[in-house]
Amino acid sequence: MESIQIHDKQFVPFINRDKISRYVEFLANQIAEDIGPDEVPIFIGILNGSFMFAADFVRNYPNDCHITFVKMASYEGVNSTGKIKHLVGINEDLTGKTVVILEDIIDTGNTLAEIYEIFRDKKVKKLLIATLFFKPDVFRKELPIDYIGKSIEDKFIVGYGLDYDGLGRNLPDIYQLKL
């Protein structure tokens, strides 16, 4: 892995694809063990960032499951705007279902708070949150995160679905903003 440039920023190698695969496999197996083989959960990926994570996750999930997506956004450039844009909703009836949210990254918790707000009236059996990456230093909400692939520092990252102004999602590895 070599340093890369996206738009006007330099990024350095941070987490390679093999480690990412191990985090995803760990999460899929842990959630499958906790939910059990008789429950058919609905996994909900948060677009656009979680599309790679969600795809690899369900490939690793050993039991039956459903998957769908919702689109929300809180970033412009490398900074969180603090404002959530709820762009595409959920059409499935979630009443009495176990729902697992698949997030690419949780930092401030603003998107997570919006997720909890959306699901408050859905009458789900259980709502679980799984994130591939978590930035505990900037997390400001009193909300549970049930599964964490890896905790990282508060530095901007791209790759494996995460972007910088629309670019970098296709990278198979994770890169960190060079300061």
Predicted regions: what is each one?
Residues 1-179:
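PRPP-associated nucleotide enzymes
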